[in-house]
Amino acid sequence: MIYEFDPADIMYSYMYPAMVRTFRTAGFQWITQFAYDPIDLAFANTEYQTHFLNLAYTPNKAISMKIAAEAARSLKRGESYGSYPQDTIFGNGFRVSYAEDLSELNNGEKFYYSNQTNTPPKDASKLVSIAGCGSSPIVDYEGTGAYFIDCLESGVWRLEVMPDAVVVNDPFAKPSLKKEVVSIIYGTWDMALRIPDLGKAFTLTALDKKNDRKEETVTNGVICDLRPGVYLLKRNGCTPQQN
């Protein structure tokens, strides 16, 4: 049993899956991360300050943790993946890269990446779940927050976009609730999607109540001035089976 683990004092996003890979190789069955920062304190990183993990404030690390959780569930106990650099690619679609500060899961149905990646999805036509930070061959996005794109049924997708997170002070220097270390910014960015099941022509509908963006039609795959929030994307000509 691992209780507890975390790469201390770093903001890199490649460590979590690599650590889980090692734990599973060593035969561990229970792997607990420590510790997730409460949203009300994460702006200053005052909670167990050598650790810093929060979806809003450390989006790259949070996506890396999501990938590590998939690794913990799917990697076989006792399986060896060789020595570096061979062990940077392991299991069913996992990859880590120090040079790119990147964790990836690319197994056909799921495509997750903690930072910008040039890796094409294994089979874009079979994707049902996408999560990332930055751009990839199927998503162009310049915002710094995480995003999640999930298939609800054929032609219907749910998009959630987190606000930008900008580091403004050293998160691991002496902490204080009077010192902000990461700033959350609710900006707008264009997002270009190249998801075969969705196509380039689709409707966009805001689902969160405070978002006053009206339903609109996208004709070229590019959602302009996208603000943080939750959206329903529906391929043109698609009749959903569920309301």
Where are these regions (language model features)?
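Catalytic-core region of carbohydrate-active enzymes that cleave or remodel glycosidic bonds
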Residues: 1-42, 48, 52-67
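Aromatic- and carboxylate-lined catalytic core of secreted/periplasmic carbohydrate-active enzymes
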Residues: 37-173
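C-terminal beta-sandwich/jelly-roll accessory domains of carbohydrate-active enzymes
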Residues: 111-243
